[in-house]
Curated annotation (Swiss-Prot):
Belongs to the methyltransferase superfamily. RNA methyltransferase RsmG family. This is Ribosomal RNA small subunit methyltransferase G. The lineage of its organism: Bacteria, Bacillati, Bacillota, Clostridia, Eubacteriales. NCBIfam families: rsmG_gidB (TIGR00138). S-adenosyl-L-methionine binds at G79, F84, A130, E131, R149. Keywords: Cytoplasm, Methyltransferase, rRNA processing, S-adenosyl-L-methionine, Transferase. HAMAP family: 16SrRNA_methyltr_G (MF_00074). It comes from the Bacteria. It is found in: Cytoplasm. GO terms for molecular function: rRNA (guanine-N7-)-methyltransferase activity. Signal peptide: none annotated. InterPro entries: rRNA_ssu_MeTfrase_G, SAM-dependent_MTases_sf. Specifically methylates the N7 position of a guanine in 16S rRNA.
Length: 239
């Protein structure tokens, strides 16, 4: 058994996640593809099997602590990069419909290759800016859960993500130990965009004990038509 497979199995067990042999094989295939394409695409600075298993794959699966992702749930992953957390979540919840949004064309091409190589059905990579996706009627307020692992401030991520979440759905921001401080700064933005802070779940990654926070924001009203603002504005002038 590979180090990657062993780490994923043990970590998933510790997290209370049931994982099949097929899913473990998909994670191994995904890892191989990441390493294969990493030199040309700069997908990740972390390349060791155990590190990738913990800091990318298991870290992505922490989302299940906040949102169980029941059969048929529609999930959008904004600023997904190499596919985190969307692809690991899709592997473990194959019945979920997943859209992976990535603004870098080469990474979007990689995501399409990964979806094909792993045999993931009801999964699609979208090459676009988050601000444009949030305005698109095909995506606006269409998702049960919108997730982001990006490093932007929560107020910025809220403008990227909340417009795509349907009323009653949620926006899940994956953050580090300073999530509470960011939530305070993002309070007005969340309210303006139709959201309400529901909870902040603090947890630790298996094996490393690294601290993570999941910020759960419930969509309680429609996002005003003028949001998101044009590409680049949310980052320059957060709400």
């Amino acid at each position: 058994m590979s180090v990657l497979a062993e780490t994923i199995k043990e970590g998933a067990r510790e997290m209370g996640i049931v994982i099949t042999e097929k899913q473990v094989r998909q994670f191994e295939e995904y890892y191989s593809l990441i390493i294969e394409r990493n030199k040309s695409l700069n997908l990740t600075a972390i390349t060791g099997e155990r590190e990738v298993a913990v800091k990318h794959f298991l870290d992505s699966l922490t989302c299940l602590k906040a949102v169980p992702l029941e059969d048929g749930t529609s999930l959008m992953d904004v600023g997904t990069g190499a596919g985190f957390p969307g692809i690991p979540l899709k592997i473990c919840r194959p019945s979920v419909r997943v859209k992976l949004v990535e603004s870098a064309e080469k990474k979007a091409v990689f995501l399409r290759e990964a979806i094909g190589r792993l045999g993931l059905e009801m999964a699609e990579a979208i090459w676009a800016r988050a601000e444009d996706v949030g305005k698109d009627p095909d995506h606006r307020e269409k998702y049960g859960c919108v997730v982001a692992r990006a490093v932007a401030e929560l107020a910025v991520l809220a403008e990227y993500c909340l417009p795509a979440a349907g009323v009653g759905g949620c926006f899940l921001a994956m953050k580090g130990p300073k999530a509470e401080e960011e939530a305070v700064r993002a309070k007005d933005a969340i309210k303006i965009l139709g959201g309400r802070l529901e909870e902040i779940i603090n947890l630790k990654l298996p094996f490393t004990g690294d601290r993570r926070s999941l910020v759960v924001i419930r969509k309680i009203g429609e996002t005003p038509e003028k949001y998101p603002r044009r590409p680049g504005v949310p980052q320059k002038r957060p709400l």
